[in-house]
Regions:
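Glycine-rich phosphate/pyrophosphate-binding loop and the adjoining helix
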Residues: 78-137
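Helix-loop-strand module that forms the ligand-binding subsite of alpha/beta enzymes
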Residues: 3-89
Length: 137
């Protein structure tokens, strides 16, 4: 059989070996889909990926750039948002808990209603992002 923490240890090791973290996820019922939540639950392990102290959680994963591409059928960020955004604060909080603070979000919004505009906005956001456009990291 597999040791109880073997999968968790493997996933944490993969994260530790990266120069940057790239996640791509849809908004699913206002937050992350179950498969991403499962990965986060395996990686966010007390005593290994973070320590719990009287002053709060202290991440043990070295900070690295994290770029999170988020797609949504509707608008969830900005002044035109018509639904609450629980995804970006949740991912920010859990990555901060691990020790990752250099976080950027790229949103592809309203793909269900205006896909051409959504993809044009996404391309513009990618072109403006220094790490994705070939600019200085």
């Amino acid at each position: 059989g597999v040791a109880p923490l073997a999968v968790s240890e493997e996933l944490i090791g993969e994260l530790e070996s990266t120069d940057f973290l790239l996640l791509a996820t849809p908004v699913n019922n206002f937050t992350v889909p179950a498969v991403l939540k499962l990965w986060l639950d395996q990686v966010a392990r007390v005593g290994r990926a973070f320590e719990s102290t009287p002053d709060g959680k202290i991440g043990k994963i070295a900070d690295r750039p994290a770029i999170i591409a988020v797609s949504s059928g509707s608008v969830f960020l900005g002044e035109d948002a018509r639904q609450p955004d629980f995804l970006t604060p949740y991912l920010t909080a859990i990555l901060n808990c691990l020790g990752i603070f250099d976080i950027s979000f790229i949103a592809v919004q309203a793909v269900g209603r205006t896909p051409e505009r959504a993809w044009a906005d996404a391309r513009a956001a990618i072109a403006a992002h220094p790490r994705l456009s070939g600019g200085t990291p």
